[in-house]
């Protein structure tokens, strides 16, 4: 399954900021994602808004939870199941709610 991870943090907890910098944060996050076995499809960053977005693929809830642990340590994490838009359109057509 695909999941969208939306992780936010405050200015005060920003690992790339000046108040509580963590120069190893991206390495920790990369290690955590790889160790968990979760496949990172893509990642995005809204630096001024202090928000990360990741699209990941996994069928293992425990692995998903382990993958995002570094993000939880600096802020809040929301995980939602998603599907590719093209797959959603095909599904909607198949069940008759779209032409």
Regions from the language model: what does each represent?
Residues 1-35, 39-50, 62, 85, ...:
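Short S/T/G/P-rich N-terminal loop/turn motif that feeds into the first structured element of a domain
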Residues 8, 55-57:
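Short hydrophobic/aromatic beta-strand micro-patches
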Residues 35, 57-89:
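An amphipathic, aromatic/His-enriched active-site/gating alpha helix that lines ligand/cofactor pockets
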């Amino acid at each position: 399954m695909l999941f969208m991870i939306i992780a936010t943090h405050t200015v005060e907890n920003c690992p790339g900021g000046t108040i509580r910098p963590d120069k190893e944060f991206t390495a920790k996050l990369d290690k955590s994602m790889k160790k968990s076995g979760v496949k990172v499809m893509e990642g995005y960053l809204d630096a001024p808004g202090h928000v990360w977005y990741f699209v990941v693929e996994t069928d293992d809830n425990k692995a998903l939870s382990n993958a995002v642990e570094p993000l939880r340590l600096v802020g809040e994490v929301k995980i939602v199941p998603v599907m590719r838009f093209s797959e959603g359109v095909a599904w909607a057509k198949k069940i008759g709610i779209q032409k």
